[in-house]
Structure formats: structure tokens, C-alpha cells
Amino acid sequence: MQDAIVSGGSEAGIIKSGIGGFNAVQALSKRNDDPKTASRPFDLDRDGFVLGEGGGCVILEELDHAISRGAKIYAEVVGIGLSSDAYHMTAPHPDGEGAISVMNNCIRDSGLTYKDVDVVNMHGTSTPLGDKAEAKALGAVFKDHLYSMNINSTKSMTGPVSYTHLRCRRWTLCR
């Protein structure tokens, strides 16, 4: 096993085929005149997202190794969750089954309970189908505890950066 790993990537997907594909499935916001309000995950008036480009990198290190070298530790990964939602090519299962599965897997792997979670960074595409399914999944997993949590989506600030976000944001539980 390695003491530390670096994982990163970048995406520059604002090209004709990228815009055309997302436009064809009506996933793009039509609020282009006001970028600050265009992408609004979980908002009642959401209508899609604004494409983004970006890159990211994470450094993951064994806790003992990081402590021994005096590293500043930002978080400890205590659980991970993996799942797949193969319901439809462009839409999640209406009840959020894939999201429910990944969140439950992560919580189970951590040894914590759903009441130990205080912040959730969701996929949050700002699309009517996606956000509705994620909201249902949050309710199914976190029940009444949902109302004492903070919920956000990085996409509201960056737009989806396609495959890069998979490297930068996975379903993890951190302390």
C-alpha cells in the first residue's frame, strides 16, 4: 500500500458537441442573461445548468504518515460509497435509488449513523428530474435529520466540469 497518492484531472468541454449534446437533452439553463442566477440546484425555478470547465487534484495520505511528517490535515476519510444508477441514459431513477444506495453504502462503510452527517455536497444539476430524485433520496436516507443539515452543490458555482468532478468529489464521509 502507498503512503500517499495524487489524483487529478481537467476538463475543457465547452465545445460544439458538448453544448449540442446537453442542449439536445434540455439540460442547459436558459437564464444566460444573468449568470449569477442561472444554475440553481434544488430551487423551485431551476431550469438546467451552465456548462463549466476546470480541473482539480486531491492528495490522499495515510493518517499516520501525514501525522509523522507534520502535515496539515484538512479531513479524514472515514467511509466511501459506490453505486451506479443505470435507470436511464440522461435521467436518474425517479425515486433516487442510485443516490440512496451510494449514501447508505458510505454511511455503512464509515461505521457512523446518518445522524452523524452534518454537510452533504450533492450532484445538484439544477434539472427538474435530477434535483427531484436527489431530494427524494436525501429524505429517504436522512429522514427528519435532513432539516438540521447543510446541503449544497458545487455545480451552482462552477457548472458541471464533466468527469473532473468525479475525481474531486466522491461520496465520502470525512471528519
Could you tell me what each predicted segment is?
Residues 164-169:
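Conserved small/polar residues in nucleotide/adenosyl-binding loops
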Residues 6-10, 72-80, 115-122, 149-155:
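Beta-strand segments within the central parallel beta-sheet cores of soluble alpha/beta enzyme folds
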Residues 87-96, 125-142, 161-163:
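Short glycine/threonine-rich loop-to-helix capping motif typified by GTGT followed
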Residues 35-110, 118-119:
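Condensing-enzyme catalytic core mediating Claisen C-C bond formation in acyl metabolism
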Residues 10-14, 26, 55, 63-65, ...:
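Glycine-rich beta-alpha junction loops
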Residues 1, 25-50, 137-163:
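Conserved catalytic cysteine-centered active-site region
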